[in-house]
Amino acid sequence: MGERSWPATPGEGWSAADRPPLLVSACLLGVACNHEARANTSEAVVALRRTRRLVPVCPEVAGGLPTPRPAAEIQPSGRVCTAAGDDVTDAYERGAAHAVRLARAVGATGAVLKARSPSCGCHEVYDGSFTRTRVPGEGVTARALRAAGVPVWSEEDVEAGTVDLQPGDEGR
């Protein structure tokens, strides 16, 4: 896939096709797909639509998990399990592979993912004890996207203004 040059600033009549694509956790855009069948809408992320083509993805649903579904956490072994002990790692890996394929297909210049999710967390995740204890780490999809060369950020990065996702600012 060839490199595309994006306009430095959005102009009048800038169509969605002219905006650099950004993969986004669907729950951040208002889709009720989290494990509780709720959205985690982030207005700061939704506002990126003014300068970006937002491409929604829910890796957990894409991996075959239902909505709602039992909460899951990454265990110290690296497996993803529910509190009842069901191993759902394969579904998480299928969802991550789908997200990587989607990012490549649309030429995504980055991804904004749900913080602390076992799929999408990109700075920290829960430790696997189901006590809401946070540890440094990445979710399955965040790790796969980063390994594929796609920069990843959380909605908290966008909300805090620690990343500027204007066209041309990828990787900052």
Show where each model-derived region lies.
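Short, hydrophobic/glycine-enriched beta-strand segments
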Residues: P21-C27, P56
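Short N-terminal binding/cap micro-motifs at the start of the first secondary-structure element
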Residues: G30-A37
